[in-house]
């Protein structure tokens, strides 16, 4: 064996250790240098772009001179050349930037700016306000530099007293022009108005013959029949010396003149112009001349208030008050924002002022992007008080109208409503309407596929999903070229419309790989895992048309039909026991998995254990962000938003041991989730059982066994489905099974979170008609209930999917689908629900726990349906369940339950198949109404009259009709 020489060790050390370390260090330095250089180049490029943008839009301070208004021939001026070199105030080198505050000092770098600032510039630097003392001040950069072609002219100093006003975009103008007259020597104010009256670059001067000129400015030329040149706007024969124009022929003819001329204004009163307050100007034209007034003159301010007196002495039959309004924005300001009042004025002006004139087609896009409000035409009221009328109209324009607010709110709501993938109103119909012509069929076992058969049977009995599949709403918009799960489920649902033998789910099972599911292949699988894959795949199929889950925002994903049915939220609250800081987190769920070990004997016990506080200690300590350490904490889970289709999974399988918990866990067929919900707007979440999945085994193990399902069809009959075998069973048999998965359907669907947050969920018609104030008397409540029942045929309907049924459209429903019509049977006016016992307390109707009983004195403060009905001034039963179900009721077997309250006895009738409820204390035509009462203390019998010898301890009973005859489904009544 070769032995290494001693001289090789240092060489190996240098080669394999020292050199790699040195190379790593050098590469790191080189990488840092390259990154720094790239970062510097990026910053320099950004600074250069910003500087170029600032230089492009830089303007000097401009004070428009003089009080004379002379028209000049229309001409376009070439842009002035800007200086290419600027000197740094510190090092006198080429300057690239300037002071962002005063806009008057330039620098070559940020370092020079800091040095100059510390040398004393911070004492002399003043905020730039549009009329500063610097000659190099300007406007800040805006988002769109193409909207300001006039800035090139303003960068050059003024020569003489000519100021070019044509092609100016007054949307971005820093200070407006001053227009005065020589005859009055007026010191007028700028063309100003409220900020809500501006932003339009395409403005014009709208004048009427011998009338007013509504002053605005048009950037583009108009094609006008008989166009009048701009030099004739103010005729030379009509001087400005006469102030007593009669204006008898005001408003005879309207003409639009392009105001693209050059205005000469001697700067005689420039100092006073700066000191004048902002005011609106009225420009009008009469037979004697053209006049300009302002509210400053009418108020007696300034040395030229006598002009207002001469103006008041003029008698005329009418006038047009025009306001040449321009709003200037001082930097910084955003671009492209249009106020609400401006939009309303713009609509009015578009219909009045642009009527009969053809616009320049090249300006359509610009007019759409940036719009402004121009003052509207008004009727001629006389020349007296022109300035006062103008001032009042300016104030009126500042206040948006109520109609405008309403229209804007409606527009916003319409836009928000469009961001919903499946309308909530249609989901309400899927929950409310009755379904006919559908009956479950068996499924062939395609090799250990009982888990899939049981889950598919439960999903096909999910009412809203079943209606959605039968209406083929997905396939109408499906754009998938490959195999689609939703389209396949629609094909399977269509087979349920026809009577026959079992069908095969082989097409679904053979394509499980296409939906990312690793189940199948003939092996035994978990039904819960298959359900999760199926629900998530249906959610993905709903989003495929929009580009997939990654392309759709999270808030929009919650508005799909699958998410609205199965989606919910859990709330996790952790409280630090050291600093008592509380943190909350929310988690989206598709089902609710509950532990059943220990003392749990019912579903309510499992929910109580799930929502009980848990101490985090030992190895499970909580890391508090405020304490910055692992501390003891207390954690509590609660259901923040319960899904509309609540899937409860009882964890019977033990992980690691392959064992199964075969203990008996009772469950109700009407579940009250009020004690376990923290959401404020989620009351009362009442759920009805409609499907159960049971795992049957003989070896008490999780790796073997068989899945069967119990489902309630659309007519309310419970069926036991074992693959291809379907048989009717009683409710008692369903309640005695060891359930693995429970499917509950909400009594009324909860709206999505986006509806609740933005207040877009419209109250259904039935809820609006059913609501009443608690202050009304019993007679008013009764009349209100009668009107509700009388109109119920317009609120509820039936989806009839029988093969012989034709296409019927509903004129009152918003959803236009096939096989739909309103209920018109004998019991259409009744309000029904499916009641059952399923309770462990003799006084409870809605939960099996004594804590939720609403008839005992000790728990009266807890929530109950009767309390809810009392607070709303409604009947306790019909107020909760009335709006939810309206089914027809074929003749069947009824049992009555009579209770005696301190006032009068009432009798209730119950039928298992249809859930029909009636009250003998109410009129005969109101079978769905139940009188409100808190102290039921009589028994039930099989007749409408209370028996003489009734057990006073019996409270509630019901009998259903099966093939063998009467089957008692409640243990609280004795026959």
Swiss-Prot record:
It catalyses: Thiol-dependent hydrolysis of ester, thioester, amide, peptide and isopeptide bonds formed by the C-terminal Gly of ubiquitin (a 76-residue protein attached to proteins as an intracellular targeting signal). Residues 354-369 have a biased composition (Basic and acidic residues). Disulfide bonds: none annotated. Keywords: Cytoplasm, Hydrolase, Metal-binding, Nucleus, Protease, Thiol protease, Ubl conjugation pathway, Zinc, Zinc-finger. The active site is at residues 450, 706. Residues 309-322 have a biased composition (Polar residues). Zn(2+) 2 binds at residues 99, 102, 121, 125. Highly expressed in young panicles. Expressed in roots, leaf blades, leaf sheaths and stems. Expressed at low levels in brown grains. One of its GO terms (cellular component) is cytosol. SUPFAM superfamilies: Cysteine proteinases (SSF54001), HIT/MYND zinc finger-like (SSF144232). The keyword Nucleotide-binding does not apply. It is an enzyme of class 3 (hydrolase). It is found in: Cytoplasm; Nucleus. GO terms for molecular function: cysteine-type deubiquitinase activity; zinc ion binding. GO terms for biological process: cell division; flower development; fruit development; leaf development; protein deubiquitination; proteolysis; regulation of protein stability; root development. Belongs to the peptidase C19 family. Recognizes and hydrolyzes the peptide bond at the C-terminal Gly of ubiquitin. Involved in the processing of poly-ubiquitin precursors as well as that of ubiquitinated proteins. Involved in the regulation of grain size. Acts as positive regulator of grain width and size by influencing cell proliferation. Functions partially antagonistically with GW2 in the regulation of grain width. Possesses deubiquitinating enzyme activity in vitro. The dominant gain-of-function large grain1-D (lg1-D) develops significantly enlarged grains. This is Ubiquitin C-terminal hydrolase 15. It comes from Oryza sativa subsp. japonica.
């Amino acid at each position: 064996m070769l032995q290494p020489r001693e001289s090789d060790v240092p060489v190996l050390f240098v080669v394999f250790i020292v050199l790699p370390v040195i190379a790593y260090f050098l590469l790191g330095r080189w990488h840092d240098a390259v990154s720094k250089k790239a970062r510097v180049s990026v910053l320099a490029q950004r600074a250069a772009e910003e500087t170029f943008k600032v230089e492009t839009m830089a303007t000097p301070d401009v004070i428009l001179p003089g009080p004379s208004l002379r028209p000049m021939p229309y001409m376009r001026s070439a842009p002035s050349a800007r200086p290419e070199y600027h000197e740094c105030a510190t090092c006198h080198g080429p300057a690239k930037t300037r002071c962002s505050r005063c806009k008057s000092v330039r620098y070559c770098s940020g370092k020079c700016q800091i040095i100059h600032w510390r040398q004393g510039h911070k004492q002399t630097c003043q905020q730039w306000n549009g009329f500063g003392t610097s000659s190099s001040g300007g406007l800040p950069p805006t988002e769109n530099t193409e909207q300001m072609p006039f800035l090139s002219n303003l960068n050059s100093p003024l020569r003489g007293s000519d100021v070019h006003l044509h092609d100016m975009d007054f949307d971005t103008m820093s200070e407006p022009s001053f227009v005065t007259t020589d005859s009055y020597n007026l010191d007028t104010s700028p063309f100003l108005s409220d900020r809500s009256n501006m932003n339009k670059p395409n403005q014009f001067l709208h004048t009427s013959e011998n009338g007013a000129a509504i002053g605005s400015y048009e950037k583009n030329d108009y094609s006008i029949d008989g166009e009048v040149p701009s030099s004739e706007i103010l005729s030379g024969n009509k001087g400005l010396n006469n102030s007593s124009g009669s204006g008898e022929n005001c408003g005879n003819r309207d003409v639009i003149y392009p105001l693209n001329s050059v205005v000469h204004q001697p700067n005689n009163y420039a100092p006073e112009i700066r000191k004048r307050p902002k005011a609106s100007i009225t420009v009008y034209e009469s037979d004697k001349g053209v006049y300009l007034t302002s509210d400053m003159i009418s108020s007696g301010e300034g040395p030229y208030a006598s002009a207002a007196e001469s103006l008041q002495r003029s008698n005329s039959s009418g006038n047009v008050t025009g306001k040449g309004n321009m709003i200037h924005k001082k930097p910084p300001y955003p671009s492209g924002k249009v106020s609400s009042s401006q939009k309303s004025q713009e609509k009015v002006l578009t219909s009045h002022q642009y009527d009969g004139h053809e616009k320049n087609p090249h300006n359509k896009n610009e007019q759409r992007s940036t719009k402004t409000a121009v003052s509207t035409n008004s009727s001629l009221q006389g020349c007296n008080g022109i300035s006062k009328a103008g001032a009042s109209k300016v104030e009126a324009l500042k206040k948006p109208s109520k109609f405008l607010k309403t229209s804007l709110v409606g527009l916003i709501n319409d836009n928000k409503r469009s961001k919903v993938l499946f309308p909530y109103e249609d989901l309400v119909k899927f929950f409310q309407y009755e379904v006919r012509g559908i009956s479950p069929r068996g499924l062939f076992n395609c090799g250990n596929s009982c888990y899939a058969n049981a889950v598919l049977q439960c999903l096909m009995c999910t009412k809203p999903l079943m209606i959605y599949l039968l209406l083929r709403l997905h396939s109408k918009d499906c754009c998938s070229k490959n195999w689609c799960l939703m389209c396949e489920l629609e094909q399977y649902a269509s087979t349920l419309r026809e009577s026959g033998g079992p069908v095969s789910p082989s097409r679904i099972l053979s394509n499980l790989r296409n939906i990312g599911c690793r189940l199948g292949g003939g092996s035994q699988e978990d039904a819960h895992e298959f359900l999760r894959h199926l629900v998530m795949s249906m959610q993905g199929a709903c989003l495929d048309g929009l580009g997939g889950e990654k392309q759709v925002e999270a808030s929009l994903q919650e508005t799909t039909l699958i998410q609205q049915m199965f989606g919910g939220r859990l709330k996790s609250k952790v409280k630090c026991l050291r600093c008592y800081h509380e943190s909350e987190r929310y988690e989206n769920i598709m089902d609710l998995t509950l532990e059943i070990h220990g003392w749990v004997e019912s579903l309510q016990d499992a929910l109580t254990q799930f929502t009980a506080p848990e101490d985090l200690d030992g190895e499970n300590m909580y890391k508090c962000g405020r304490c910055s350490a692992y501390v003891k904490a207390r954690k509590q889970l609660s259901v923040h938003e319960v899904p509309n289709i609540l899937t409860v999974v009882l964890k019977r399988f033990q992980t690691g041991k392959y064992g199964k918990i075969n203990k008996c866990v009772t469950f109700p067929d009407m579940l009250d989730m009020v004690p376990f919900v923290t959401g404020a707007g989620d009351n009362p979440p009442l759920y009805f059982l409609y499907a159960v999945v049971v795992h049957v085994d003989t070896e008490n193990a999780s790796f073997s066994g068989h899945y069967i399902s119990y489902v309630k069809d659309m007519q309310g009959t419970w069926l036991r489905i074992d693959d291809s075998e379907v048989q009717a069973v009683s409710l008692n048999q369903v309640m005695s099974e060891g359930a693995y998965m429970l499917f509950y359907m909400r009594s009324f669907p909860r709206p999505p979170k986006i509806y609740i947050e933005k207040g877009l969920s419209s109250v259904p018609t039935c809820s609006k008609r059913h609501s009443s104030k608690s202050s009304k008397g019993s007679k008013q409540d009764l009349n209100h209930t009668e009107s509700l029942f009388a109109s119920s045929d317009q609120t509820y309907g039936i989806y009839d999917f029988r093969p012989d049924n034709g296409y019927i459209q509903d004129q009152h429903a918003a959803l236009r689908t096939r096989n739909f019509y309103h209920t018109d049977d004998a019991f259409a006016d009744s309000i029904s629900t499916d009641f059952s016992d399923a309770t462990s307390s003799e006084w409870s109707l809605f939960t099996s726990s004594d804590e939720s009983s609403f008839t005992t004195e000790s728990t009266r403060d807890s929530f109950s349906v009767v309390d809810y009905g009392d607070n709303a001034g409604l009947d306790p039963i019909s107020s909760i369940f009335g709006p939810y179900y309206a089914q027809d009721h074929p003749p069947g077997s009824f049992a009555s339950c009579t209770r005696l309250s301190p006032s009068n006895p009432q009798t209730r009738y119950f039928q298992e198949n249809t859930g029909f409820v009636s009250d003998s204390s109410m009129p005969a035509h109101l079978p769905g109404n139940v009188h409100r009462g808190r102290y039921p203390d009589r028994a039930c019998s099989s007749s409408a009259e209370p028996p003489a010898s009734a057990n006073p301890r019996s409270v509630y009973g019901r009998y259903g009709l099966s093939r063998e005859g009467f089957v008692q489904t409640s243990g609280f009544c004795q026959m």
